[in-house]
Regions:
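Short conserved active-site loop signatures built around small residues
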Residues: 1-64
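Gly/Ser-rich "nucleophile elbow"/oxyanion-hole loop immediately N-terminal to the catalytic nucleophile
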Residues: 64, 115-161
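Short beta-strand element of the alpha/beta-hydrolase
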Residues: 65-74
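Short amphipathic alpha-helix adjacent to the substrate-entry channel of hydrolases
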Residues: 81-103
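Short glycine-enriched nucleophile-adjacent loop
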Residues: 164-176
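A conserved short beta-strand
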Residues: 178-202, 218-219
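Active-site-adjacent alpha-helix of alpha/beta-hydrolase-fold enzymes
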Residues: 213-291
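Alpha/beta-hydrolase-fold serine-hydrolase catalytic core, especially in secreted/extracellular enzymes
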Residues: 259-263, 269-356
Length: 356
């Protein structure tokens, strides 16, 4: 689906199956001035006042309704399109009864002159919710192929790199009635987002200075590679630690640290070199696992997570608790797990200081 006017990709121009309307992001991200923005507008043919709603969809046969999974790519060279990079797992999910959509945010990515230094993260998150608005409409419109086939009560977001930072922010915005910097900008999202997967997420943006994002009552999975040369630390651990379960429903959160995985091989559009030339020439790629094996891990863990979160198959929680139970499926290597659910009770967390 797309606006039908893309000048670089036919699948979002003449070949798109469902036409969408462009959206105005200027209240959140102004691209109207500067040489870099001028170059970008020449390349893309649009700016922040008319961002397209483009996406690739994989879906199962049958009437449904099927849970909806949105994939959000991260930052890369904008002309090397990132949204096709998750087909390997989207096709698997479609075969298991999910609608999977990989959305296009390439126009927010880097070019030869640099990137937006994470100032675009809010816009990345807001665009996720604008895509979900389209899905809500299609599910209610008889003249669309997705009429009454989407289970809008069971939605999950899967974000990679900056997409991994945008996804949890989208969950926060989803519950807000107005833009926190301008109350004249009303929001009316209120989607039923049940789960979130962060793949090697960044963590450089916060809605409040020096205050990390806090989530509650949602299922969470973090995948992080030990040989990541883009996101050097496990930035997603903040989300894990700041996610709290406060209602009476069952929720869970899990981390898988993959020693020999890098940043880019979770996407077929990126690859083994996490940093651009000439710095990439300094990388020692020998210890990395192969891309197929790394993506096999992502397929295994993300599908198990979604089955547990959106379909209530708690038997899939076993590998999220202990990677050794998946040894017959995933490549041989070093892994570390972390897991907690709403039944977990703290006896002591050693945060009491002198008041013990």
């Amino acid at each position: 689906y797309g606006n039908g006017d893309d000048k670089n990709r036919d699948e979002y121009a003449n070949s798109c199956d469902i036409k969408t309307s462009s959206v105005d992001a200027t209240p959140f991200f102004d691209q109207t001035s500067g040489f870099d923005n001028w170059i970008r507008e020449i390349f893309w043919g649009f700016g922040a006042s008319n961002y397209p709603i483009n996406g690739r969809v994989w879906y199962p046969e049958g009437q449904g309704p099927f849970p909806l999974v949105i994939f959000v790519h991260g930052n890369h060279l904008m002309q090397e399109y990132s949204d096709p990079g998750y087909e390997y797992i989207a096709t698997l999910l479609a075969s298991k009864g999910y609608i999977a959509a990989s959305i296009d945010e390439n126009f927010l990515n880097s070019n030869w002159s640099g990137d937006y230094s994470h100032n675009e993260i809010f816009t990345r998150a807001w665009l996720i919710l604008k895509h979900l608005e389209c899905w809500r409409e299609w599910n209610q419109q008889e003249d669309t192929p997705f009429y009454q086939t989407v289970d809008m009560d069971n939605i999950a977001l899967v974000g990679h790199s900056r997409g991994g930072q945008a996804a949890p922010l989208a969950i926060v915005i989803n519950k807000q009635k107005r833009y926190y910097k301008d109350a004249n900008q009303d929001f009316n999202f209120n989607f039923s987002i049940k789960g979130i997967v962060e793949i090697a997420p960044t963590a450089f943006y916060s809605m409040h200075k020096d205050k990390p994002l806090e989530l509650e009552n949602i299922d969470y999975l973090l995948l992080q590679g030990g040989y990541d040369q883009d996101v050097f630390s496990m930035a997603g651990s903040r989300k894990y630690n700041n996610l709290h379960f406060t209602d009476t429903n069952f929720h869970f959160k899990s981390v898988l640290y993959i020693y020999a995985a890098n940043h880019g091989q979770f996407s077929t559009a990126w690859g083994r070199k996490d940093i651009p030339f000439p710095y990439s020439a300094l990388l020692n790629l020998t210890p990395l696992m192969d891309g197929e094996g790394q993506r096999k891990i992502a397929q295994t863990y993300i599908s198990a997570f979604l089955d547990a979160s959106l379909k209530g198959k708690k038997e899939n929680l076993s590998i999220l608790k202990d990677y050794r139970l998946a040894k017959a499926i995933i490549p041989k290597g070093y892994y570390f797990n972390q897991y907690e659910d709403s039944g977990f009770k703290y006896i002591a967390d050693y945060e009491e200081d002198l008041d013990v």
